[in-house]
Amino acid sequence: MNTAAIDQTNARSLDSTTASMVDPFGRAVTYLRVSVTDRCDFRCTYCMAEHMTFLPKKDLLTLEELHRLCSAFIAKGVRKLRLTGGEPLVRKNIMFLIRELGKEIEAGRLDELTLTTNGSQLSKFAAELVDCGVRRINVSLDTLDPDKFRQITRWGELTKVLEGIDAALAAGLKVKINAVALKDFNDAEIPELMRWAHGRGMDLTLIETMPMGEVDEDRTDHYLPLSEMRKRLEADFTLKDMSYRTGGPARYVDVLETGGRLGLITPMTHNFCESCNRVRLTCTGTLYMCLGQNDAADLRSALRATEDDAYLAQVIDDAISRKPKGHDFIIDREHNRPAVARHMSVTGG
């Protein structure tokens, strides 16, 4: 890890705490993704090994520390904040953090607070999420087949997730379904998954699998370029490119036959680096400037070194100055090691 070597005594004036974040390529950083835990109640085959060794709980930032870090980024121009994991809703007392961040929306300092979830805890938390100011969530769901769902999640129960989605919709949350497109696993189901989602007023976003972390399977066996998936869909559906954006990497098409939107996230075949507006913070206070690179900044040390937010802001600025132009993801038989050693559950997607 490349830790910012900055003398605390040379911290800039308080003006640095509100200076906007612009990387070396002129891209404004306005989107923060925060992995609040690396733990999850599922073990999805493309995300983590079945017998994961998780971070010791003593290494995690407290919820109060995560709140302070998030507030520092909001002060520096972040307008959208997404909580991820692992599974964010399994973190003990997570609603404290969500409620505190919701106050930033009330104050006009944050435009959107959202989260990505596997749906297993939504029946319990959906109504409270709305009360805290969350209006939109992403739910990861790769198949509607109970047996395949158990196979890919290893531990998950499809019924529980579907009940959670129903609870979210009933509470008034806008739900988007995220599905990783996997060759010879769920690719034949994508049309039906799309009809199901659109029929319930939900967008569907397809995602290419990414080479992150050691897992128990060879990713090349299931890698499916979304350019190929789109061609298959166009045999039965009329897909019209849209300018619609949500602030993330998805490119959207309108599906005329269903009246819904289909998003495509293509880090492998058509990366989204040129418009990247985001950085990722882990539950240990590590800031990754790029999903597909290993360079990182240690914000935990800066956070705990002083109560002076000007020093923390300077460490953040130093990290943003190292944000790379793009990633180097490759999936093929010659590159069977992951491009990035850390698991997606650590980085938060």
Curated annotation (Swiss-Prot):
Chain residues that bind GTP: 33, 82, 116, 176, 278-280
Key word Transferase present: no
Catalytic activity: GTP + AH2 + S-adenosyl-L-methionine = (8S)-3',8-cyclo-7,8-dihydroguanosine 5'-triphosphate + 5'-deoxyadenosine + L-methionine + A + H(+)
Sequence ranges assigned to domain Radical SAM core in this UniProt record: 24-249
EC number(s) per entry: 4.1.99.22
Cofactor: [4Fe-4S] cluster
Residues that, per the record, bind [4Fe-4S] cluster 1: 40, 44, 47
Ligand binding (S-adenosyl-L-methionine): 46, 86, 140, 210
Binding sites annotated in the UniProt record for [4Fe-4S] cluster 2: 273, 276, 290
Any one Gene Ontology molecular-function term assigned to this protein's record: GTP 3',8'-cyclase activity
UniProt keyword Disulfide bond present: no
SMART domains: Elp3
HAMAP family (UniProt xref): MoaA_B
Family from the record: Belongs to the radical SAM superfamily. MoaA family.
Protein purpose: Catalyzes the cyclization of GTP to (8S)-3',8-cyclo-7,8-dihydroguanosine 5'-triphosphate.
The protein's name: GTP 3',8-cyclase
Lineage: Bacteria, Pseudomonadati, Pseudomonadota, Alphaproteobacteria, Hyphomicrobiales
Gene: moaA
